[in-house]
């Protein structure tokens, strides 16, 4: 079993093709049978530019600190499926420095984040529902 990850769908397709060719060549040379199956295939998550801008401006208005990550998250994410059917944006709220990450055994959700995060989501929802300019541009 192997886990493959790529930033773009095209890169993943090429990676799977090349790896399959190499493994098949090795199996053939050793006289072995080979069965390849893909499970939990997730499309890449690509943020819509307009929605990303809307999240940024709304977060700034709410007094949030905005930090850009240098590299995309490498975990599997089924959120990419949404982007195939409608504009979407995936962003993190963040718990700040000094907190164990999500899957760490000592992770404990910081409840202080709830009010601010819910308020941010509420404002984003209102803008997308009632602001005709926001709707037109997305």
Can you say where each PLM-predicted feature lies in the sequence?
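Metal-dependent amide/peptide-bond hydrolase catalytic core
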Residues: 1-138
